[in-house]
Amino acid sequence: MTSRSVCEKMTMTTENPNQTVVSHFFLEGLRYTAKHSSLFFLLFLLIYSITVAGNLLILLTVGSDSHLSLPMYHFLGHLSFLDACLSTVTVPKVMAGLLTLDGKVISFEGCAVQLYCFHFLASTECFLYTVMAYDRYLAICQPLHYPVAMNRRMCAEMAGITWAIGATHAAIHTSLTFRLLYCGPCHIAYFFCDIPPVLKLACTDTTINELVMLASIGIVAAGCLILIVISYIFIVAAVLRIRTAQGRQRAFSPCTAQLTGVLLYYVPPVCIYLQPRSSEAGAGAPAVFYTIVTPMLNPFIYTLRNKEVKHALQRLLCSSFRESTAGSPPP
């Protein structure tokens, strides 16, 4: 069965006999030859396993170690949970499409759910990076005010607000996208349901959607990025005033990991969402990096340069090993 014949079964007739609407979509996915499908499946399985295991390990470490009680580690736990979920929204469906042609099919409702979940998690991560930058600004530039400003209650409230704003932001985009009429074709030239490739299939005017998407990038994403940049300008200025090189390195070390994460988060989406609507080539690589590779890299980025997290991981692994050894019967 070809993708064309599959797509023909994904439309249903409306009250108007001359008009059909799409009931399912066909995710064309990544471009690869059939003989390489098994290799790509194993590659994505490996990446997904590392992503989920790495992020859940960070989450478990932050939640169980009393030495990681600072707000920055509280927010790192939220980031790890977001990355594990973000990878879960996209990668399993990609892997299903690598196995069978039917694995590339997604229902209209399933597409809406995937789009909502992706933008909910990605938007929340965007706001979380801003909160993390503000946390570092207070810790370095306002150290005396920091314990009062970033107490446990404030951390919980700020994290909750980022999740609430992310959910609202995703709901707006999802409702605007799926209020449109989709009457064919049903081929999404992408590996998951995202706003630009889905809008290309709409049979009605998408001007409002495109304006809202550009406004979202201009106001939400750019606004968060500006706040992050301003925070780090003050941070760098404060770090440069520290007299010892060791003090400067200790103060700025957590910030370098955050800056790396911010760059990996912002650069690929800009390449995706700001390219012309008619352009499909070139979107795949940044999208794969943004949705699949970055969530895998974040645990390494935030642990390799952070001695506290590395020591906490060692304590957790050693404790787990001792418990498993003590529980095993003697030879």
UniProtKB/Swiss-Prot annotation:
One of its GO terms (cellular component) is plasma membrane. Disulfide bonds join 111-203. Residues 1-38, 89-113, 175-211, 273-283 are extracellular. Residues 60-67, 135-153, 232-251, 305-331 are cytoplasmic. One of its GO terms (molecular function) is olfactory receptor activity. It comes from the Eukaryota. Glycans are attached at residue 18. It is a multi-pass membrane protein. Keywords: Cell membrane, Disulfide bond, G-protein coupled receptor, Glycoprotein, Membrane, Olfaction, Receptor, Sensory transduction, Transducer, Transmembrane, Transmembrane helix. The chain crosses the membrane at residues 39-59, 68-88, 114-134, 154-174, 212-231, 252-272, 284-304. Coiled coil: none annotated. Odorant receptor. This is Olfactory receptor 10S1.
